[in-house]
Amino acid sequence: MIKSPPSSPRPRRTFLAQTLGLTALAATGVNALAQAKPTIKIGFVDGWSDSVATTHLAASIIRSKLGYPVELVPLAAGIMWQGVARGDLDMTLSAWLPVTHEAYLTNFKDKVQIIGANYPGAKIGLIVPDYVKATSLADLNNFRADFDNRIVGIDAGAGVMKKTEEAIKAYGLEMRLLPSSGPAMAAELDRAYRANKAIAVTGWIPHWMFAKYKLRFLADPKNIYGAEEHVDSVINPGLNAKAPAVVAFLKKFSWKPEEIGAVMLAVEGGSKPAAAAEKWMADNTARVSEWTS
């Protein structure tokens, strides 16, 4: 009996090689697609609770819904604006206009693009606990001893600090403005509130402290701090070509006091900003869809 020669293994090996080659090519293609989207660099002010909340929510949406890698860069407000203008940053969601960041806008208006408000109805001024006697900047001198003749501020050079310096002159306040930081100011407020002591701080809304304490702004009859403001999304113009889907999202993204308040309070309560943002996204899928559809 004549035995048939064994079949050559070469065709099988060739097939396997081709299959593996196609698989590798497919994998390379997938990786290329995954890497095709550029990293979006977002500047924010780490000591501002609204900036932290809004930035982390936007970053989570851009990553998970739009598929872009995101890098968050904490900076002082002036450097943040400069970074967007120079193209070192693609965007910020922390531009307070028209008053607080007026000087920055004047300096960089030809190099940035204002997309619109992500939080309307913002406000800056001097904030006091609801139990204090003073009601207005105009009569604050009458109660200055209650406040130990001082106003607790935030970072020197911040817009609200400059306006407070103007207010001290305009109202003839015999009080010292003490620079600190956002977290330090909030800690001072917490200590005074727990002890039922009078305290005046430079502040703003949105801020988690309005959800935690009963506070109010002192009236400003001379309108030193200006009318209501809005927190805007501002981009480097190059983002239009770099990530048009991100720009489209920013044009729709605007949230309400109770929405941002929930994230800010969660962070103040100990949650990591990214975790608080992701939980809010999971609990508000319809709202997120409005911004990304």
Residue ranges and their predicted role:
Residues 39-56, 77:
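Extracytoplasmic "Venus flytrap"
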Residues 93-108, 191-216:
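A ligand-binding cleft/hinge motif common to bilobed small-molecule-binding domains
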Residues 110-157:
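A conserved helix-loop-strand patch within extracytoplasmic ligand-binding domains
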Residues 123-133, 229-242:
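A bilobed periplasmic-binding-protein/Venus flytrap-type ligand-binding module shared by bacterial periplasmic
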Residues 1-29, 33:
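N-terminal secretory signal peptides
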